[in-house]
Amino acid sequence: MKIYAPFAGIVRCHVDVGEKTSTGQELATVEATKLESPVVSPGPGTITRIAVADFSDVIGGDLIMEIGEA
């Protein structure tokens, strides 16, 4: 599964590569002017790739991370 930024802002990741995730777990946060939105896992799995560095700028639709099979 590929996880994308919902809108432009600064991304902060809360997981590491190799970490197991569960449905609804908060993976990252995207922060824009006075707005902070959690990015949650759509299903169980293992983080296989983090495509952005912490506190980097993203635009809506940018790849944040990938989740593989659980």
Place the predicted regions along the sequence by residue.
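Short beta-strand-turn/beta-hairpin segments enriched in glycine/proline and small hydrophobics
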Residues: 1-11, 26-44, 69
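Short histidine-centered loop motifs in beta-beta connectors
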Residues: 5-6, 11-18, 49-53
